[in-house]
């Protein structure tokens, strides 16, 4: 193919390489030997060779000169059917593309289902040059939805190769964002497969459906995980993008104005703001399969804290079905920590409670500590070990560490107070055992009473047996 000399076979989608390697498109080299075998070089053949070389080296002035001669047309096809415009697009030479289009080149030309727009989107070059080429072709009515033989559209190639602005321009020009190729891949799937986080965010913003599966039943998130792009896996699996589809309702001009910017700082700010928008409410609802309730709750300014304290009548008020309520209530039951009424401790401090009540208090306190330990263990398990895998925007780590230090101090104070309580109880127990005037426990009194009852019963039985013997003796006499 025409691009073979620069980057190997320029197979964008439908254009497979040929069996022959002699296509005459070597950069900086013309096959003069083959011409000599023909006996002599004809002027027209010489001009064609010069034209090929000019396209290869990007010599715009020579291309214009040869086109002006009238011997060569912009729609002439070289070996394997490529036109000059297709070759210029394959090397992302925007200036050559402009010259050829101004000369009347057909922007909608295709060869074996490979369009010029597909060739431009899969070109090797800077994104700036590729973007200019694509913009020129779209301005000449190139169709952004024509697919190659593998059913891949231009947006899939742009997403695969990491060209964020090209993806956005194609969508603004009418490209279908959720089209699937022969393997069921969408543009989002290709971006997830290649690890292009910025394109994943942009596609979600443009309305990409992250739940579309491939032919083998894989979601984009699973494709990302399989290729070890764990940050994208987390982004697609555990969060819901609040900007999803936000740009779909804008006009083409408004969309281009919003998405085509070369300011890297603005682009980075957008990426981080998109990440920061993911919150604990979305994560909680996604874990329960209730993503559809996110927008409704956000519209009513309901936070996760509010959700966790809602009553059943409030769930009904906000449109939760009985099945949704059961899911949330079951989750709340697992998270529930039995509350201790610490306001009653003043009574306990005066020892105006029974032993059973005091024991119940200690059991509740122990249970609550167990819940807290489990909660911390779960957090440790869920936190990523690599900072690159953190999707949500976090505050300064110093804030977290300072709170953890306070927690450690509080736990140490609690441990000290519990030890003091234990020592006090042990001291009271020892003093009671050594006090000769202490009242026996209820269990001890009941044991003593049972012994008296047993002895009385034996005495009565013995006396009755004696009367029975005397009666029999008296009757015999």
Swiss-Prot record:
Principal location listed in the UniProt entry: cytoplasm
Protein purpose: Plays a central role during spermatogenesis by repressing transposable elements and preventing their mobilization, which is essential for the germline integrity. Acts via the piRNA metabolic process, which mediates the repression of transposable elements during meiosis by forming complexes composed of piRNAs and Piwi proteins and governs the methylation and subsequent repression of transposons. Its association with pi-bodies suggests a participation in the primary piRNAs metabolic process.
InterPro entries according to UniProt: Ankyrin_rpt, Ankyrin_rpt-contain_sf, Asz1_SAM, SAM, SAM/pointed_sf
ANK repeat start and end residues: 46-76, 80-109, 112-146, 150-179, 183-212, 216-245
SMART domains per UniProt: ANK (SM00248)
Any GO BP: transposable element silencing
One Pfam family of this chain: Ank_2
Protein name per UniProt: Ankyrin repeat, SAM and basic leucine zipper domain-containing protein 1
Gene name of the record: ASZ1
Gene3D superfamilies reported for this sequence: Ankyrin repeat-containing domain, Transcription Factor, Ets-1
Native source species: Aotus nancymaae (Ma's night monkey)
């Amino acid at each position: 193919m025409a691009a073979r000399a620069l980057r190997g076979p320029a197979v964008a989608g439908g254009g497979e390489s040929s069996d022959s390697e002699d296509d005459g498109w070597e950069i900086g080299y013309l096959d003069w030997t083959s011409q000599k075998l023909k006996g002599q070089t004809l002027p027209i053949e010489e001009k064609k060779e010069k034209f090929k070389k000019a396209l290869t080296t990007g010599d715009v002035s020579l291309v214009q000169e040869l086109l002006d001669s009238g011997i060569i047309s912009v729609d002439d096809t070289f070996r394997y059917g490529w036109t000059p415009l297709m070759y210029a697009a394959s090397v992302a030479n925007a200036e050559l593309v402009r010259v050829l289009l101004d000369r009347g080149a057909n922007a909608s030309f295709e060869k074996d289902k490979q369009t010029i727009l597909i060739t431009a989107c899969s070109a090797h070059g800077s994104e700036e040059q590729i973007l200019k080429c694509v913009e020129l072709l779209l301005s000449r009515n190139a169709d952004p939805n024509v697919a190659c033989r593998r059913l891949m559209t231009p947006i899939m190639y742009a997403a695969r190769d990491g060209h964020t602005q090209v993806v956005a321009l194609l969508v603004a020009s009418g490209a279908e964002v959720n089209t699937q190729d022969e393997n069921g891949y969408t543009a989002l799937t290709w971006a997830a497969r290649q690890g292009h986080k910025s394109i994943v965010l942009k596609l979600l913003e443009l309305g990409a459906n992250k739940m579309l599966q491939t032919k083998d039943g894989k979601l984009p998130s699973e494709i990302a995980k399989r290729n070890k792009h764990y940050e994208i896996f987390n982004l697609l699996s555990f969060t819901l993008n609040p900007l999803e589809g936000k740009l779909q309702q804008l006009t083409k001009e408004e969309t281009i104005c919003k998405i085509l910017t070369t300011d890297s700082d603005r682009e980075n700010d957008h990426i981080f703001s998109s990440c920061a928008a993911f919150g604990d409410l979305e994560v909680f609802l996604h874990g329960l399969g209730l993503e559809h309730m996110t927008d409704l709750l956000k519209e009513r300014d309901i936070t996760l804290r509010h959700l966790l304290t809602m009553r059943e009548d409030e769930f009904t008020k906000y449109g939760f079905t009985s099945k949704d309520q059961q899911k949330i209530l079951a989750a709340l039951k697992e998270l529930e920590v039995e509350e201790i009424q610490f306001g009653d401790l003043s009574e306990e401090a005066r020892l105006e409670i029974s032993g059973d009540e005091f024991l119940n208090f200690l059991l509740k306190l122990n249970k609550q500590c167990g819940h807290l330990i489990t909660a911390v263990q779960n957090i440790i398990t869920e936190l990523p070990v690599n900072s690159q895998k953190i999707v949500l925007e976090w505050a300064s780590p110093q804030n977290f560490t300072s709170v953890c230090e306070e927690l450690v101090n509080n736990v140490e104070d609690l441990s000290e107070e519990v030890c003091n309580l234990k020592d006090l109880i042990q001291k009271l127990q020892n003093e009671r055992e050594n006090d000769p005037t202490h009242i026996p426990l209820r269990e001890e009194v009941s044991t003593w009473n049972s012994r008296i009852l047993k002895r009385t019963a034996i005495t009565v039985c013995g006396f009755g047996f004696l009367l029975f013997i005397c009666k029999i003796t008296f009757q015999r006499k």
